[in-house]
From Swiss-Prot:
The keyword Methyltransferase does not apply. It comes from the Eukaryota. Residues 12-184 form the N-acetyltransferase domain. It is found in: Cytoplasm; Nucleus. The keyword Magnesium does not apply. The lineage of its organism: Eukaryota, Fungi, Dikarya, Ascomycota, Taphrinomycotina. It comes from Schizosaccharomyces pombe (strain 972 / ATCC 24843). Its main location: cytoplasm. This is Uncharacterized N-acetyltransferase C18E5.08. It holds the Pfam family Acetyltransf_3. GO terms for cellular component: cytosol; nucleus. Belongs to the acetyltransferase family. InterPro entries: Acyl_CoA_acyltransferase (IPR016181), GNAT_dom (IPR000182), N-acetyltransferase (IPR051531).
């Protein structure tokens, strides 16, 4: 299994997540504050969560040359009053449509206890660096309409509003934000 560890000044980002993380993953994904802003909707049990998101672990079994998706669990580096334990607090994912694509979608979620602390911006930024190091030149963030926090993260990271809206598989509207190599280096 291929393990990847990234760091920011405050967080460790690990791919794959650990099996033991699924209790916390379920807690976050079943919180209406989170699930109401995500395409997957409400997750009502650990078993359903594990079934729906097993790729958080199994993608790491795919060889580097064939891999097209990475999900990084976010873990605080240090225990503090804000982070009383070193445990899973959210994730950032990177997904290409196919192995040869130079474009990837980013997705992310943070437990509501940790909103407003710049965690998503910091960790998504680090995953963009990882993607760039792995020949991804263009990035897309596509929050559902009404997910203002994800929109703010995209804009803080330099993404441009494409003015495009798409309808997802479940009928929800998504707003497309793009970040290209030209924007990052321009």
């Amino acid at each position: 299994m291929s393990k990847i560890i990234l760091k920011t000044s405050r967080f460790l980002l690990k791919s794959p997540v650990e099996e033991d993380d699924f209790d916390q993953i379920t807690k976050i994904k079943s919180d209406p504050l989170v699930s109401n802003t995500q395409l997957y909707g409400k997750v009502e049990s650990r078993e359903l969560c594990r079934f729906m998101f097993q790729h958080y672990i199994t993608d790491a079994r795919i060889t580097k040359t064939r891999r097209k998706r990475w999900v990084f669990g976010i873990y605080p580096l240090e225990v503090s009053s804000t982070f009383p334990s070193i445990c899973y607090i959210g994730n950032v994912g990177l997904s290409k449509k196919n192995v040869k694509s130079d474009t990837a979608n980013l997705f992310f979620e943070i437990g509501p206890l940790y909103w407003g602390m710049g965690i998503a911006t910091e960790c998504v930024g680090r995953v963009i660096e990882f993607g760039s190091e792995n020949n991804i030149q263009n990035f897309i963030i596509d929050p559902i309409i009404g997910n203002e926090a994800s929109k703010k993260v995209a804009l803080k990271l330099g993404f441009e509003d494409s003015g495009t809206f798409v309808t997802a598989y479940n009928g929800l509207q998504q707003h497309i934000y793009k970040l290209s190599k030209q924007i990052r280096t321009g």
